[in-house]
Amino acid sequence: MNDLTKKPILQVLAGETVSPPPVWLMRQAGRYLAEYRQVRSRAKNFIDFCFSPDLAAEVTLQPIRRFGFDAAILFADILLVPIALGRKVWFVTGEGPQLEPFDPRQFEELRLDQTEAVLGSIGETLKRVVPELPDTTTMIGFAGSPWTVATYMVEGGGSKDRFRTRVAAWEYPEAFDGMLDRIADVTAEYLIMQARSGAEVLKLFDSWAEGLPEPLFERVVIRPTKRIVDAVRAAGIDVPIIGFPRGAGTLYPRYARETGVTAIAVDTGVDPAWIQSVLPAGMPVQGHLDPSVLRAGGAALDGEVDRLLDQWAGRPHIFNLGHGITPDVPVAHVEQLLARIRDRS
């Protein structure tokens, strides 16, 4: 059993207020670190990098050694789940992820029988990382939420507006929901494996939840997220789950109430006073510094850190960004951020 008194993030996720708040950053293991780039050069491609427990464990640990973040987050990618579903995924330098576009009407072709075989190495990464962590550091596992994963599968990669996917969700609702269910079921199995391999917290990233009408948001974001949470709990896994429906706007409260997540992560556009007034009482919140101000540094960074610390004071809060850290952020700015937070007491 985890000793909550030693792990500030677990304290917050249990509903406690910790001052100063614990901090970690999305994409904290990444290209802004020279040591990451050195390890990355040893893998022939990004997918192989993710599936190499030795390399993935090393880059997971790098930001902990350098900065002493309160959490390590598993180094992996949300698009490993489509591989387990039987889809091809590859990364093109300068272009990002590429997939063979998938027709949701063929959802029954998606494999449900090879999750452990394909994703088992991710559990091995966790088993390598956990023994190396300081006693106060929490291990976070994660996966992409079904809607966001589906957008990449249907579009064949990244998309500015996910239009093809949204059309498919309206045009073929039964097939589309069947596809989401298959993604959700494999994702749940994947997260259960992560928890059994040492993850103390799980996070679901719905990076493309923005701009959906409420009926569609309910169908493609809330419903499959709840399906995952329910499956994880039914397997006897009781670790906290953080949900991040980025860009959900006024639908954040519904997501928080209806999915069963323990805590909610919010994006940079969310007003702290508003979200505190509409969330379930005492629900922990993670976020939500603008990554651009971290890149800018200086007085602007100090001012934004102070503003967020003031606005979240007295609440169970984990300090993070509202989106992932960018590759061009100077290490000195991360050090400045941490010093500003940790100097508050």
UniProtKB/Swiss-Prot annotation:
Transmembrane segments: none annotated. Gene3D superfamilies: 3.20.20.210. Substrate binds at R27, Q28, A29, G30, R31, D77, Y152, S207, H323. Its main location: cytoplasm. One of its GO terms (cellular component) is cytosol. Its EC number is 4.1.1.37. It is found in: Cytoplasm. GO terms for molecular function: uroporphyrinogen decarboxylase activity. InterPro entries: UROD/MetE-like_sf (IPR038071), Uroporphyrinogen_deCO2ase_HemE (IPR006361), Uroporphyrinogen_deCOase (IPR000257). Keywords: Cytoplasm, Decarboxylase, Lyase, Porphyrin biosynthesis. Belongs to the uroporphyrinogen decarboxylase family. PANTHER family: METHYLTETRAHYDROFOLATE:HOMOCYSTEINE METHYLTRANSFERASE RELATED, UROPORPHYRINOGEN DECARBOXYLASE. Homodimer. This is Uroporphyrinogen decarboxylase. It comes from Maricaulis maris (strain MCS10) (Caulobacter maris).
